[in-house]
């Protein structure tokens, strides 16, 4: 019988270094002989592509609609018969996910009822609880500076450090609420990439 795989989620503000650390973690786990599937939200499915257009600031910004769309995209991400998270888990694969419902709580919670966003996700029958969530905590000003260096046009939630601070506060609030029910780790990612990687590997 194949041992069930695990879901490991990396979260944080845009510009916190998630992509770098996910790539490094993927390589590390593969070197240990594990099967690994690297994925992200929003997905590349139709709903996910529509969400990316919203985030690029080319469409309306109703937060309740965004929350519902992210939930729909997340459910397809989980249940898709060929590329869904459930399928990979059933094959014993470790799923590394760049963002999950924690991002919905933090981002859409800036302009909608954060408790409602949490409820529609956490009470959804098809939802999966990650085996580990790692939050890379970086100063919002640092994140904003990193984004400004690599993007000519910031996305919807990257426009100013004050908004990014509100998002960080939301992250810390919801992670504190969930810490007794879920396996959550907060890492100081103001450190260099090598130091952050060492911290992550203590928990994986």
What is each PLM-predicted segment?
Residues 2, 26, 141-204:
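NTP-dependent small-molecule kinase module
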Residues 32-119, 124-125:
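ATP-dependent small-molecule kinase phosphotransfer cores
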Residues 3-7:
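Pre-Walker A (Motif I) flank of P-loop NTPase domains
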Residues 13:
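P-loop (Walker A) phosphate-binding loop of NTP-binding proteins
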Residues 21:
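Hydrophobic positions on the alpha1 helix immediately C-terminal to the Walker A/P-loop
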Residues 10:
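Hydrophobic anchor at the beta1->P-loop junction of P-loop NTPases
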Residues 104-169:
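A glycine- and Lys/Arg-enriched "phosphate-lid" helix/loop adjacent to the NTP-binding pocket
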Residues 18:
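Conserved lysine of the Walker
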């Amino acid at each position: 019988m194949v041992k069930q795989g695990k879901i490991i989620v990396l979260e944080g503000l845009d510009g916190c270094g998630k992509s770098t650390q996910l790539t490094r973690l993927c390589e590390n786990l593969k070197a240990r002989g594990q099967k690994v599937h690297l994925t992200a939200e929003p997905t590349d499915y139709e709903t996910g592509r529509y969400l990316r257009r919203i985030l690029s600031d080319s469409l309306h910004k109703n937060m309740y609609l965004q929350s519902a769309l992210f939930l729909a995209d997340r459910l397809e991400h989980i249940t898709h018969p060929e590329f869904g998270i459930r399928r990979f888990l059933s094959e014993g694969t470790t799923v590394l996910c760049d963002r999950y419902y924690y991002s919905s709580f933090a981002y859409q919670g800036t302009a909608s009822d954060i408790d409602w966003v949490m409820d529609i996700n956490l009470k959804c029958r098809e939802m999966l609880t990650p085996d580990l969530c790692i939050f890379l905590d970086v100063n919002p000003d640092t994140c904003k500076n990193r984004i400004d260096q690599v993007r000519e046009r910031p996305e919807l939630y990257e426009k100013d450090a004050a908004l990014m601070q509100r998002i960080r506060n939301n992250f810390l609030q919801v992670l504190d609420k969930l810490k007794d029910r879920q396996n959550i780790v907060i890492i100081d990612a103001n450190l260099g990439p090598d130091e952050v990687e060492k911290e992550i590997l203590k928990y994986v």
